[in-house]
Amino acid sequence: DKPMVARQGKEGPEVLIRKMRERKITVLPVVDPDGILVGEVHLKELLQLRKERILNIDSIVRKEVHSILGDTVVEDILPLMTKTNSPIWVVNEKREFEGMVPLSSLIIEVTGKDKEEINEIIQNAIEL
C-alpha cells in the first residue's frame, strides 16, 4: 500500500479533503514534484481553504515537521513522540518521502505487546 501524500502544486483542498476522509486521517505529508518532503497539511486547515475558495495549499503547509531516516532506531524516535501530535515521517538521505512511523508500531516495539494485547488493554480501559 503506497503512502498517501499531498502533491504540492498539483492537488488542491478539495482532492486532499476527499483523500483524507476516505482513509479517515487528519494529516498528510506534502511532497514537491520530485517527491521531497516539504511539510504536512491538516484537514481542519484544508476545510478552511475550501470555505474561502482558495485552491492552492501553500499557505497552510506546516514546514517544521519531524522526519527520520528509515534505519533510525526506536530509542531515537521516542523522544520525538513527546514533541509532536503529528506523525513522524520517514525519508531517505535526499529527503524523498518514504512513509510514516505509526504510533501503534512504536508502542508494540517498546512494550513488547502485540496489537491484540494492546487492543485488549484499550478495551479494558474503555470498560472501566
What residue spans do the PLM features occupy?
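Short C-terminal domain-edge/linker segments immediately following a structured domain
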Residues: 60-61, 71, 91, 97-99, ...
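A diffuse structural propensity rather than consistent per-protein peaks
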Residues: 12, 42, 56-57, 102
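A broad, low-specificity signal for short, low-complexity segments enriched in glycine/proline
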Residues: 26-30, 48-51
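The conserved cystathionine-beta-synthase
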Residues: 5-25, 31-34, 67-94, 103-115, ...
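Short hydrophobic beta-strand motif reused across regulatory alpha/beta modules
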Residues: 38-46, 98-106
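A short, polar/charged loop-to-alpha-helix boundary motif
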Residues: 44-59, 106-120
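Solvent-exposed, flexible loop/coil residues
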Residues: 50, 64, 72
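Bateman (tandem CBS) regulatory domains
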Residues: 1-5, 53-65, 121-128
